[in-house]
Curated annotation (Swiss-Prot):
<comment type="function">
    <text>This protein is part of the stalk that links CF(0) to CF(1). It either transmits conformational changes from CF(0) to CF(1) or is implicated in proton conduction.</text>
</comment>
<keyword id="KW-0066">ATP synthesis</keyword>
<comment type="similarity">
    <text>Belongs to the ATPase delta chain family.</text>
</comment>
<keyword id="KW-0472">Membrane</keyword>
<dbReference type="InterPro" id="IPR000711">
    <property type="entry name" value="ATPase_OSCP/dsu"/>
</dbReference>
<dbReference type="GO" id="GO:0046933">
    <property type="term" value="F:proton-transporting ATP synthase activity, rotational mechanism"/>
</dbReference>
<keyword id="KW-0406">Ion transport</keyword>
<keyword id="KW-0375">Hydrogen ion transport</keyword>
<keyword id="KW-0997">Cell inner membrane</keyword>
<protein>
    <recommendedName>
        <fullName>ATP synthase subunit delta</fullName>
    </recommendedName>
</protein>
<comment type="function">
    <text>F(1)F(0) ATP synthase produces ATP from ADP in the presence of a proton or sodium gradient. F-type ATPases consist of two structural domains, F(1) containing the extramembraneous catalytic core and F(0) containing the membrane proton channel, linked together by a central stalk and a peripheral stalk. During catalysis, ATP synthesis in the catalytic domain of F(1) is coupled via a rotary mechanism of the central stalk subunits to proton translocation.</text>
</comment>
<dbReference type="GO" id="GO:0045259">
    <property type="term" value="C:proton-transporting ATP synthase complex"/>
</dbReference>
<keyword id="KW-1003">Cell membrane</keyword>
<dbReference type="InterPro" id="IPR026015">
    <property type="entry name" value="ATP_synth_OSCP/delta_N_sf"/>
</dbReference>
<keyword id="KW-0139">CF(1)</keyword>
<keyword id="KW-0813">Transport</keyword>
<dbReference type="GO" id="GO:0005886">
    <property type="term" value="C:plasma membrane"/>
</dbReference>
Length: 182
């Protein structure tokens, strides 16, 4: 996702405050939950993104629905600020920017593993261990099914691509056979 500069600024400020209080991972989880909640309820999203609704009403709604309900004061204050500035539309970008900044500080590299079929938990663990060993970095992988793959996996992590798909093996075999035939 493309993240605006303003979203990066909000995320950086929120991370700085959250780190001071030692709640940076909690804040990350809260941001993700809020983004998911907004995506799941279009009427709530439309309410907060509607410029015709005054910021006072939005602030009151934020405080009434989140204050004292397990959401950190830092996240509530950020949402209040977004309501004041009529910038609720960048909440998802702030969440992504926050995650990226947190990953950078914790030395985490994210990646995606695509496979034709769902991978068993032990296969996922094995893949993570092998990629961690090769890159010598802490990694977090997400797994996706790709019906275009005949079999095997394709992992893209931190600018690296590990392609162990049947498609690639067949291409290499074809190239080798053509090379030997000539």
């Amino acid at each position: 996702m493309r993240v605006s500069e303003i979203s990066k600024r909000y995320a950086k400020a929120l991370l700085a405050v959250a780190k001071q209080k030692g709640i940076h991972t909690q804040v990350h989880a809260e941001l993700q939950a809020l983004v998911k909640s907004f995506a799941g309820d279009v009427s709530v999203k439309n309410y907060f993104e509607n410029p015709m609704i005054g910021s006072d009403q939005k602030i009151a709604a934020v405080k009434a629905s989140l204050s004292g309900k397990g959401v950190s004061e830092e996240v509530v204050n950020t949402l209040v600020l977004l309501a004041e500035k009529n910038r609720f539309g960048v909440l998802e970008q702030i969440s992504f920017a926050y995650r990226d900044l947190l990953d950078l500080e914790e030395g985490v590299t994210r990646g995606v593993v695509r496979s034709a079929q769902p991978l068993a938990a032990d296969a996922q663990k094995d893949i993570e261990q092998k990629i961690t060993k090769v890159l010598n970095k802490k990694i977090v992988l997400t797994y996706e099914q790709d019906p275009k793959l005949l079999g095997g996996i394709v992992a893209t992590v931190g600018g690296w691509t590990f392609d162990d798909s049947i498609d690639t093996h067949l291409k290499k075999l074809n190239e080798e056979l053509n090379r030997r035939a000539n």
